[in-house]
Amino acid sequence: MDTEPDFSIVTPSYNYASYVRECIESVKNQEGATFEHIIQDAGSTDGTLDILNSYPHLKLHVEKDSGMSEGINRGFRKARGKWVMWLNTDDRLLPGALAAVKAFADSRPDADIVHGAWTFIGPDGALQRPMKALPYSLNMHIWYGTYLASTALFLRRSTTIEEGFL
């Protein structure tokens, strides 16, 4: 019997052959947490599917969709992890990311959302600009809005289901 993984990483995909391998490797090499990696591909025609099929650990689903949000929601519906997040094909997780989120989430059983820092990556793959996660403040949210990068946003799956996905 399969046990519930700590995380379900959902990656919407469509014609991103030049980036998808780095995305997959960044998830595959995570340590300190259990995970499943669900790829929702909308029918890529640029070689992306050949790359995806070379990774037997992926849960690959190839289905036409009406856009990225539909692909993400389909992936969320298939997810079994305690926490879900989506990682676009041109994004990647830094080493130790899932272990750090797991440690924090385990220390805060009341949390339904965990958000952390992230770094912009240039077209050449170089890390460019680190962005820090700021403590939540209602005042800051009202006056400046709150930007939550999907690559650093983890949602409790049970809450995501109750609230109706994206």
PLM regions and their residue ranges:
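Glycine-rich, basic loop-to-helix element that forms the pyrophosphate-binding segment
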Residues: 63-79
